[in-house]
């Protein structure tokens, strides 16, 4: 298929309005929309076609509450690295949507999946994690569904694995919060908050 300028423009807009958000409305997401997000993840490439990502949809309020407690403990521990004005700024940042997002996914990487028969990963096992990252970033079409997504990284991964009773060969990668944003913005939250501005990607040539 050859794509036209209208396709390119539409994709650029979806990517620009990436909606990496932390503030969600509680509106439930239609199951048909969730099915489309899953289908887009299924289209992702992976090393050796191993498809190492594993996803647990977490609907239980009790489990979400425990993950939020995990976050609060990890956030407090991480905050000890900052002092003065930076510590004050850190305290004001909203770094999770666990308390609001209607759809929450725990994403894991299978450390040694049978699929793919080891192709392409013997010398670079990290390609399994890279494949998982490509899979859940494919859900970037969420902006096209008028949804936002926030990845929560301030967590104790081993505690999440225990909490969700993940198999021992699954490594926790990401906690994804998905829902309709409270507001839309094409500027990353940390840039707007003054914590870290968006920087251009540096390319070098050899």
From Swiss-Prot:
GO terms for molecular function: 5,6-dimethylbenzimidazole synthase activity; nucleotide binding; oxidoreductase activity, acting on paired donors, with incorporation or reduction of molecular oxygen. GO terms for biological process: cobalamin biosynthetic process. The keyword S-adenosyl-L-methionine does not apply. Involved in the biosynthesis of cobalamin (vitamin B12). Catalyzes the oxidative fragmentation and contraction of the isoalloxazine heterocycle and the cleavage of the ribityl tail of FMNH(2) to form 5,6-dimethylbenzimidazole (DMB) and D-erythrose 4-phosphate (E4P). NAD(P)H is only required initially to reduce FMN and oxygen drives the oxidative fragmentation. Belongs to the BluB family. Homooctamer. It catalyses: FMNH2 + O2 = dialurate + 5,6-dimethylbenzimidazole + D-erythrose 4-phosphate + H(+). The gene is bluB. It comes from Rhodobacter capsulatus. Its EC number is 1.13.11.79. This is 5,6-dimethylbenzimidazole synthase. FMN binds at residues 18-22, 46, 95, 153. PANTHER family: NAD(P)H NITROREDUCTASE RV3131-RELATED (PTHR23026:SF123), NADPH NITROREDUCTASE (PTHR23026). Keywords: Cobalamin biosynthesis, Flavoprotein, FMN, NAD, NADP, Nucleotide-binding, Oxidoreductase. The keyword Ribosomal protein does not apply. It comes from the Bacteria. CDD domains: BluB. It holds the Pfam family Nitroreductase.
């Amino acid at each position: 298929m050859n794509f036209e300028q209208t396709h390119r423009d539409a994709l650029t807009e979806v990517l620009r309005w990436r909606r990496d958000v932390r503030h969600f409305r509680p509106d439930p997401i239609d199951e048909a929309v969730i099915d489309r997000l899953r289908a887009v993840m299924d289209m992702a490439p992976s090393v050796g076609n191993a498809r190492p990502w594993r996803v647990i949809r977490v609907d239980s309020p009790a489990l979400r509450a425990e993950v939020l407690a995990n976050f609060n403990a990890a956030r407090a521990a991480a905050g000890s690295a900052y002092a003065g004005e930076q510590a004050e700024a850190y305290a004001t940042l909203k770094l999770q949507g666990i308390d609001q997002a209607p759809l929450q996914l725990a994403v894991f990487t299978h450390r040694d999946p049978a699929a793919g028969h080891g192709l392409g990963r013997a010398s670079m096992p990290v390609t399994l994690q890279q494949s998982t990252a490509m899979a859940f970033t494919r859900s970037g079409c969420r902006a096209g569904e008028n949804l936002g997504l926030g990845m929560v990284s301030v967590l104790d991964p081993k505690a999440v694995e225990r909490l969700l009773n993940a198999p021992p060969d699954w490594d926790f990668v990401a906690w994804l919060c998905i829902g309709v944003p409270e507001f839309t913005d094409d500027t990353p939250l940390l840039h707007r908050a003054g914590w870290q501005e968006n920087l251009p990607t540096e390319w070098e040539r050899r």
